[in-house]
Amino acid sequence: QATTRITTPGGKVIVIDPWLKTNPKTPAAFKELSALGKVDLILVTHAHFDHFADAPELAKIHNAPMYGPAGMNQTVAALGILPGNLAPRFGKGGTILPWGPTGPKITAVRAEHSSELGWKDAAGKDVVHPGGEPVGYIVEMENGFKVWHMGDTGVFGDMRLIGEMYRPDVVLLPIGNHFVMSPQDAAMAVRDMIRPRYAIPIHYGTTPQLRGTPEEFIGALGTGSGTTVLVPQPGQKYDF
């Protein structure tokens, strides 16, 4: 779906949108959260279950902060899902320096989606709570290498501006259609607006609605874009 584990050159481990335990595409070896190993920081792009699901438990296991949109984490703290110190807030355009000025820095950027947090009340009834505004994240490593994780989004014109401002080396972008970009829209964004070195399609194939495929994305991107498309299998890693 969108779960991503990043290990920076300095050894910091950042996990984005962890949904592993009930995800039908998760390999058996990764169904237990302990399989992720060390986790220093968690990023959640928005409050929908397939992005938020395992994040609070992971934060508690590792005593690691779960950063997310300000409105979402305000709800998280108010409901007692996590204590405030494990649910720090920041918003679009803001940059955090969790490990000081020489460590990785993380910037929240725009995403076009929705964000509601479903959580059971004291009686066990499912209740929908405010989830803040969805975001994407630019993660800049200690060596300047940049990853843009878009979370869930439709295409929007400011993708060009974000690309110009941050010059991401790798972009992870949703292609599943129905709730997010189609493969064709995602290809247009990569080819005409962002032009990263690498593109990794995410958020497809876990439900019947998410019918977009990497093959469609690659076909729509065509040749001559200058972008290399990587299609990892669940659990596969790349070194950059």
What residue spans do the PLM features occupy?
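Pre-active-site segment of Zn-dependent metallo-hydrolases
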Residues: 8-48, 53-60, 83, 114-130, ...
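Active-site-proximal loop/helix segments of hydrolase catalytic cores
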Residues: 119-192
